[in-house]
Amino acid sequence: MAATKLHPALRNAIRAGANLPTEVISATFDVQEGIKLLSAFLLRHEPVCVLTGAGISTDSGIPDYRSPGRPPHRPLQHLEFLGSHERQQRYWARSLYGYPRIRDTMPNVGHQAINELQRRGLVGAIITQNVDGLHQRAGSQHVIDLHGRLDQVKCMNCHSITTRDELQSRLLADNKALLDQFSVVHDEAVRPDGDAVLDEDLYGRFTVAACASCGGVLKPNVVFFGGSLDPEDVKRASTAVSEASALFVVGTSLATWSAFRIVRQAVEEAKPVCVLNSGPTRADGVIPEYLRLCMPIGEVLPAALRQL
């Protein structure tokens, strides 16, 4: 899409305080107008704090949980994983297959646009609900991984952190006899957390690796459902919102409280909010005034960047 750059006079007027609309813009609204409004929002409120969700990574081939047509999924619970060796076998067997898909995924134009906006000083901190590390891979700094990192593994006993690649090598070595028996139920079954649906007969024969330092239970360094966020990450996210001029939400329905409370904080602190998401969000009808762009992220973000 060709996008006309903002006229320098308009850019200066926006930076000087020209009013921006605070209305919901539907998916049927002119995309070019939405691009101009987003460009104006970013200029007017630099630096903005960015909050991202699964929708920013779908163009990289990582599916989300809530898009239309996605099969229903019961997420693994934190206590369920810790309390059952069978659940640990099931998780790590599926992750052994699914993790490389996430590890080898590349950032898309949305990640790259946010990185460039940060490089230009229009974006400050980036808070992400994603565990894929794609913001960092795109070159972004000051990224707060609110739900952890899939490329890390944590011991639940000694709390040491090791790399997921190191564990992958151990799992492959310990389960060499099973590898040729891996049968994926359907190819689209790899999920945002690196989980994959495999033949049920494998799980009971899968060897789970223990912590190399203390023999404790290993868990991916991500927040399972029912688990608690790292208090330091919560504090850093709150500080990032407070220090920013505005909040820019990208690719999330805000269904989880951990994400929605960040928006609530921005509203309580009278920060302008812009939401760019291809579908409805929890903020719809709740936040009284904000810029809502119900438009494709991979189309709108790069086009807005080209206008600046």
Curated annotation (Swiss-Prot):
First and last residues of the transit peptide: 1-16
Positions annotated as active site in the UniProt record: H147
Chain residues that bind NAD(+): 53-73, 129-132, 251-253, 277-279, 297
Membrane-spanning segments: none
Enzyme Commission numbers on file: 2.3.1.286
Annotated PROSITE patterns: SIRTUIN (PS50305)
Entry keyword set: Metal-binding, Mitochondrion, NAD, Transferase, Transit peptide, Zinc
Domain Deacetylase sirtuin-type: 28-308
The UniProt record lists the keyword Zinc: yes
A cellular component term, taken from the record's GO annotations: mitochondrial matrix
Binding note for cofactor: Binds 1 zinc ion per subunit.
A Pfam family this chain is assigned to: SIR2
Any one GO MF annotation of this record: zinc ion binding
Binding site residues for Zn(2+): C155, C158, C211, C214
Cofactors required: Zn(2+)
Keyword Zinc: yes
Compartment(s) where it occurs, according to its Swiss-Prot or TrEMBL record: Mitochondrion matrix
Catalytic activity from the UniProt record: N(6)-acetyl-L-lysyl-[protein] + NAD(+) + H2O = 2''-O-acetyl-ADP-D-ribose + nicotinamide + L-lysyl-[protein]
InterPro entries: DHS-like_NAD/FAD-binding_dom (IPR029035), NAD-dep_sirtuin_deacylases (IPR050134), Sirtuin (IPR003000), Sirtuin_cat_small_dom_sf (IPR026591), Sirtuin_class_II (IPR026587), Ssirtuin_cat_dom (IPR026590)
Domain of life: Eukaryota
Family, as annotated: Belongs to the sirtuin family. Class II subfamily.
Job of this protein: NAD-dependent protein deacylase. Catalyzes the NAD-dependent hydrolysis of acyl groups from lysine residues.
PANTHER family in the cross-refs: NAD-DEPENDENT PROTEIN DEACYLASE SIRTUIN-5, MITOCHONDRIAL-RELATED
Name by which UniProt lists this protein: NAD-dependent protein deacylase SIR4
Species: Monosiga brevicollis (Choanoflagellate)
